């Protein structure tokens, strides 16, 4: 059943880290969780064209730190940091804390980030580019950039067909049940004239934990 489990959720605490890093008591936990969801949805919607791969939120007693991983940092930062200040003021209206720190982290290789790959395919589908062409080109770019394996899947009324279906393409290996395998996963939706098309991307980058080696000791006489 490895096909049905989210690759990140299966590996959290093993080789993946949490996107939300904070602790709260039972009274504040639900409020913080709702705030995190609002922040993520707002930032994603506001800066969708900037190619946001991941949003990490860290909380302390009186501070909220937001790390935004993006392929186009200039679009969020703006001229002279104006974009950051506007984003900060808008987030402050949504949450209780008055001290918000926003860090922009550049994704050096967007072609090997599963979320950005999925969003790229979705944007091409919205421009009426063939789904087969979009998927195959995305796989080829990732493999040329050093990925060990890539799988893409598109679901919906592909090509305007009356009956919805799912089509998949893959290249290389994707060991979903190997916990030490660093598998990135991304999901995006394309809004087309025929309805929504879901895009999923699995990207295998290699094993994280080194293999155990038997130590050999030389016995000097």
Swiss-Prot record:
InterPro entries, per the entry: KH_dom (IPR004087), KH_dom-like_a/b (IPR015946), KH_dom_type_2 (IPR004044), KH_sf_prok-type (IPR009019), Ribosomal_S3_C_sf (IPR036419), Ribosomal_uS3_bac-typ (IPR005704), Ribosomal_uS3_C (IPR001351), Ribosomal_uS3_CS (IPR018280)
Alphabetic keyword roster: Ribonucleoprotein, Ribosomal protein, RNA-binding, rRNA-binding
Gene3D superfamilies, A to Z: 3.30.300.20, Ribosomal protein S3, C-terminal domain
PROSITE patterns recorded: KH_TYPE_2, RIBOSOMAL_S3
Listed CDD domains: KH-II_30S_S3 (cd02412)
Record flagged with keyword rRNA-binding: yes
Record-annotated KH type-2 domain positions: 39-108
A single GO cellular-component term on record: cytosolic small ribosomal subunit
Pfam entry (one): Ribosomal_S3_C
Any one GO BP annotation for this protein: translation
UniProt key word RNA-binding: yes
Sample GO molecular function, one term: structural constituent of ribosome
Classification via SMART domains: KH
NCBIfam families listed in its UniProt record: rpsC_bact
HAMAP family linked to this entry: Ribosomal_uS3_B (MF_01309_B)
Assembly and interaction partners: Part of the 30S ribosomal subunit. Forms a tight complex with proteins S10 and S14.
Family note: Belongs to the universal ribosomal protein uS3 family.
Function: Binds the lower part of the 30S subunit head. Binds mRNA in the 70S ribosome, positioning it for translation.
Protein name, UniProt field: Small ribosomal subunit protein uS3
Lineage per the UniProt record: Bacteria, Bacillati, Bacillota, Clostridia, Eubacteriales
Gene: rpsC
């Amino acid at each position: 059943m490895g096909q049905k489990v989210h690759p990140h959720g299966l590996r959290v605490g093993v080789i993946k880290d949490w996107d939300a890093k904070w602790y709260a008591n039972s009274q504040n936990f639900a409020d913080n969780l709702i705030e995190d969801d609002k922040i993520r949805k707002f930032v994603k919607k506001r800066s969708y064209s900037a190619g946001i791969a991941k949003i990490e939120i860290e909380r302390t007693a009186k501070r909220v730190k937001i790390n935004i991983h993006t392929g186009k940092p200039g679009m969020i930062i703006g001229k002279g940091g104006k974009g950051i200040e506007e984003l900060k003021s808008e987030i402050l209206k949504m949450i209780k804390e008055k001290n918000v720190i926003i860090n922009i982290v550049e994704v050096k290789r967007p072609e090997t980030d599963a979320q950005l790959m999925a969003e790229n395919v979705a944007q091409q589908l919205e421009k009426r580019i063939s789904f087969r062409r979009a998927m195959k080109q995305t796989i080829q770019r990732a493999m040329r950039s050093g990925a060990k394996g890539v799988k893409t899947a598109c679901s919906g009324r592909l090509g305007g067909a009356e009956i919805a279906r799912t089509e998949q393409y893959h290249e290389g290996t994707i060991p979903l049940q190997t916990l030490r395998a660093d598998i990135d996963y991304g999901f995006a939706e394309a809004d087309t004239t025929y309805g929504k098309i879901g895009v999923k991307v699995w990207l295998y980058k290699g094993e994280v934990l080194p293999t155990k080696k038997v130590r050999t000791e030389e016995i000097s006489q």
